[in-house]
Design a protein with these regions (language model features):
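Long, small/polar-residue-biased beta-strand-and-loop interaction regions
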Residues: 2-196
């Protein structure tokens, strides 16, 4: 009888240990599965710029928003409009959240204040991206900072389904509230895309 109870106790201990091991294996595999979604951006997104990833304008000509939204990189003197086209492709099978960032760069001339730089993002059909209004156009200063960095702003946050892609057009111009002066000023930003 004692021998039978000992066997049962051993079986219970063995079953308990097995259940604990299986439980921890399941937790660990679930943890690994969830943390695989934080693959570096270069392994999640493919970014292709139409030309370069830097936009620069000068204080040559302030422009009304209605005209600035139509800028396409052609038909005006250099430095009047800023325009950049890029495509973002999700190379994974999972949904990926991403950010389009604009980093203010030093210029050879005095710098135009962030409060006069209009930024407007559209898709390939020239429709405003989510968060951009047809009636109001934000200035660079008003975009949220990226990681407390006041020179780097989050211009747009989007989501791409697995293997999906999106074309983004970045339009930049000098606000018509700007007062022209004889001093040459400029504003330059680098456009980057990062997975979140």
């Amino acid at each position: 009888m004692m021998h039978l109870q000992s066997k049962r106790a051993n079986k219970l201990v063995l079953i308990s240990i097995t259940l604990i091991v299986v439980f921890f294996v399941l937790i660990y595999s679930n943890y690994r599965k969830n943390n695989n979604s934080s693959i570096p951006a270069k392994d999640q997104l493919f970014i292709k710029y139409d030309d370069v990833d830097i936009i620069e304008i000068e204080n040559k000509l302030p422009v009304a928003d209605a005209l600035g939204k139509k800028f396409n990189g052609e038909g005006t003197e250099d430095g009047v409009q800023g325009y950049l086209e890029l495509s973002v492709k999700n190379i994974t099978n999972k949904k990926v959240k991403y950010e389009v960032l604009g980093t203010k760069l030093p210029t050879d001339n005095m710098q135009i204040s962030d409060n006069y730089i209009k930024i407007y993002l559209t898709n390939e059909d020239n429709s405003p991206l989510n968060g951009f209004d047809l009636n109001t156009v934000p200035v660079f200063h008003s975009f949220p900072n990226y990681n407390s960095n006041t020179t780097k702003k989050v211009l747009y946050t989007g989501v791409l389904a697995g293997k999906d892609s999106e074309t983004i057009k970045v339009h930049m111009w000098l606000s018509d509230n700007y007062r022209i002066s004889n001093v040459t000023e400029a504003f330059k930003i680098d456009i980057d895309v990062r997975a979140k």
